[in-house]
Amino acid sequence: MPEGTTVTRLLPNICTDKMEETRDFYKELLGFVVGFEHKGWYIQMALPDKPELQLGIMRLDHEFTPRPFQHPAQGVIISVQVEDVEATYATVKARGFELAHDLCDEEFGMRRFMVADPNGLLVNMFSFP
């Protein structure tokens, strides 16, 4: 780590024009709950039993983000390690989520599948046996 830099938190924020759909997606998929909302442009979510696992949702056109960078998010894969990927896969399918990539085994030992959020960002659900 660079001298003088001590990372104390990492909080990814999804910039979107689909605030409610994105919030509902992560609530339904992962069980995240809203911990903080600010004036309709920012939602911070976390897992109730692991509040350090957080995700932010930010209105795409809000002044917080400099105008030249106000573009829909792309090229990001959100990877989420779960205890039992088979059980998670069954639950996700039963709830009607559309799969972007079916359950598979990778040569390096990961078992995974993917769904796409309302913004087209991929969520890679995985575990290691």
Pin down the residues of each PLM region.
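Vicinal oxygen chelate
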Residues: 1-11, 33-83, 89-116, 127-129
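Conserved beta-strand-loop-alpha-helix junction that forms the acyl-donor binding cleft
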Residues: 16-18
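Short glycine-/small-residue motifs
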Residues: 122-125
